[in-house]
Amino acid sequence: MNLSEIGYRRVVVKLGTSVLTSGSLKLDKAHMVELARQMACLMKAGVEVVLCTSGAIAAGKEHLGYPKLPDTIASKQLLAAVGQSQLILAWSQLFSIYGLHVGQLLLTRADLHDRERYLNARDSLNALLNNGIIPIINENDAVATAEIKVGDNDNLSARAALLCDADLLILLTDQKGLFDADPRKNPDAKLITEVQNIDDSLRMLAGGAVSGLGTGGMATKLEAADIARRAGVEVVIASGHYKDVIQNVVCKKPVGTHFTALEHPLESRKQWILAGPKARGQLVIDAGAIGAVTEKGRSLLSKGITEVKGLFQRGDTLELIDTKGKVYAKGMSRYSSADVTKLAGKHSDSIEEVLGYDYGDAVVHRNDMVVL
């Protein structure tokens, strides 16, 4: 690899189940060897690599001889517990061929929700990278419940990119990238090679495109790309079976769909608000508040709130939505749901009179808010 061609310093590579199994019921070890070789080449060239890998449940099924288990959460957790050890063993053996060590990080939403745990995870990730060790990240499916799951490794990889301050996220799948129509149904579908803005039309386009296996379709990849690019991370969605795909992407060759990063990325704390805490509730806001928040960069005042959804405490993260459910922003509330219910529609100067105390004029301050 020509060092002068490399355009990145730190790269997160996400491998979906469909890439690791090549559409079969077991891990495709031959293809994993090839992927490990490409990542090892990057490491040897001075590019730090973080691997976000799916495939634990598939590996568990294979190792146990495809047992007939009930379709329950406990069965999936069993398979994940067995399969994760096999998955990390396989990657460890493959990277050892190139004299490289790996370190395992299993995360849940809870690790990202709490600011202190988020920073601890970041420190662990950076410690591995600073010592030339390849971090291998997966969701901790053996213990994760619906409440604490990130949900898919596309979004987990985007959060990993934020954690380690990567400048490129590569999402490898069984598709060549994002198309302007479903290529399986429309032979005239064209690959979208460059995306500079993710809007509702693009989200609708990705909504029906699903990868062959795993929990992540094209819609989740678009969500991941949006999170990453807001933090200044470039994103590429490409086929995991394209020859030398990882090296070609890192050398900025025209492969897959490239998402440009925002010119002015979010600062660290707002990155955490965007990617870390799960929203505990929603505030329905009127047109005036939507304009003030999204166009003028102002805080959300109680006057603009028309409805409170969910139960939350002071400091919890909320979504700001319109009456149709469209999300305009995400931020941390200075008041509990009980408080906001009392304050909704009222002027800020009446807060102390209504509640008997005052945490400030804004329900969600602009410094604690990310506009989407």
Curated annotation (Swiss-Prot):
Domain (PUA): residue spans on this chain: 280-358
Keywords: Amino-acid biosynthesis, ATP-binding, Cytoplasm, Kinase, Nucleotide-binding, Proline biosynthesis, Transferase
Example GO molecular function: ATP binding
Pfam family, one: AA_kinase
Enzyme category, top tier: transferase
Keyword Nucleotide-binding: yes
Gene Ontology cellular-component terms listed: cytosol
Subcellular location, principal: cytoplasm
EC number, as in UniProt: 2.7.2.11
Reactions listed under catalytic activity: L-glutamate + ATP = L-glutamyl 5-phosphate + ADP
Pathway noted in the entry: Amino-acid biosynthesis; L-proline biosynthesis; L-glutamate 5-semialdehyde from L-glutamate: step 1/2
UniProt binding sites for substrate: 54, 141, 153
Binding site for ATP: 14, 173-174, 215-221
GO biological process: L-proline biosynthetic process
Subcellular location: Cytoplasm
Top-level lineage group: Bacteria
Family assignment from sequence similarity: Belongs to the glutamate 5-kinase family.
PANTHER family per the UniProt record, alphabetical: GLUTAMATE 5-KINASE, ISOPENTENYL PHOSPHATE KINASE
NCBIfam families with a match to the protein in the record: proB (TIGR01027)
Purpose: Catalyzes the transfer of a phosphate group to glutamate to form L-glutamate 5-phosphate.
Descriptive protein name: Glutamate 5-kinase
Organism: Shewanella pealeana (strain ATCC 700345 / ANG-SQ1)
